[in-house]
């Protein structure tokens, strides 16, 4: 199949999947353009704003991309009865949190990397979509070796923390009543 046919197929798939969205129906009626153009234009504008990073908006938009996509999949997983997708999503949130902590402490270095937030957004989308397996790949390559080396699986320590947290929550409940 030629690239032109692949592009047409992709656009028609977008049109089909968005047929029930009222705002896109209004766009189509008012402009005479397919719904897929609005979707692609919106994504294009989103990435241009990240790329330009005017007023620091790139950081916010990048973090929103890192929250919305896996957040949606996480909400679906919470409502499902299976646990097959839970490991992938838990792995994502561990990678996302680790990445944000490392990023916070390296802001001075990141200032010198051009288009950092664009690269970050692409990375977060890659690790955030469960079908790519990106979160598991990053976890296995970067976080797991560190955690195995420095974080001891101490069940007594975990139980002590859990008991302390329950004690605090019980105290708060007593104060509230």
From Swiss-Prot:
Residues 55-56, 105-107 are lumenal. It comes from the Eukaryota. One of its GO terms (cellular component) is Golgi membrane. It is a multi-pass membrane protein. The keyword Endoplasmic reticulum applies. Its main location: endoplasmic reticulum. It is found in: Endoplasmic reticulum membrane; Golgi apparatus membrane. The keyword Endoplasmic reticulum applies. Keywords: Endoplasmic reticulum, Golgi apparatus, Membrane, Transmembrane, Transmembrane helix. The chain crosses the membrane at residues 35-54, 57-76, 88-104, 108-126. Residues 1-34, 77-87, 127-177 are cytoplasmic. Pfam families: TB2_DP1_HVA22. InterPro entries: TB2_DP1_HVA22. Oligomer. Belongs to the DP1 family. Required to generate and maintain the structure of the tubular endoplasmic reticulum network and the vacuole. Induces high curvature in membranes and causes membrane tubule formation. Involved in membrane/vesicle trafficking. The short lumenal loops between transmembrane domains 1 and 2 and between transmembrane domains 3 and 4 may impart a wedge-like configuration, thus deforming membranes. This is Protein YOP1.
């Amino acid at each position: 199949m030629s690239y032109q046919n692949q592009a047409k197929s992709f656009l028609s798939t977008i049109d089909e999947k968005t047929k029930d969205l009222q705002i896109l129906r209004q766009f189509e009626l008012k402009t005479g353009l397919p719904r897929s153009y609005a979707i692609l234009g919106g994504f294009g504008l989103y990435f241009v704003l990240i790329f330009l990073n005017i007023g620091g908006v790139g950081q916010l938009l990048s973090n929103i991309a890192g929250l919305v996509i896996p957040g949606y999949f996480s909400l679906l997983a919470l409502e499902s009865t299976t646990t097959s997708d839970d490991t992938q999503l838990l792995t994502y949130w561990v990678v996302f949190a680790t990445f944000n902590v490392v990023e916070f402490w390296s802001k001075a270095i990141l200032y010198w990397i051009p288009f950092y937030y664009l690269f970050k957004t692409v990375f977060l989308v890659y690790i955030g979509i469960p079908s790519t397996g990106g979160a598991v790949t990053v976890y296995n390559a970067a976080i797991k070796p560190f955690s195995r080396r420095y974080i001891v699986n101490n069940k007594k320590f975990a139980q002590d923390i859990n008991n302390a947290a329950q004690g605090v929550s019980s105290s708060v409940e007593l104060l509230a009543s």
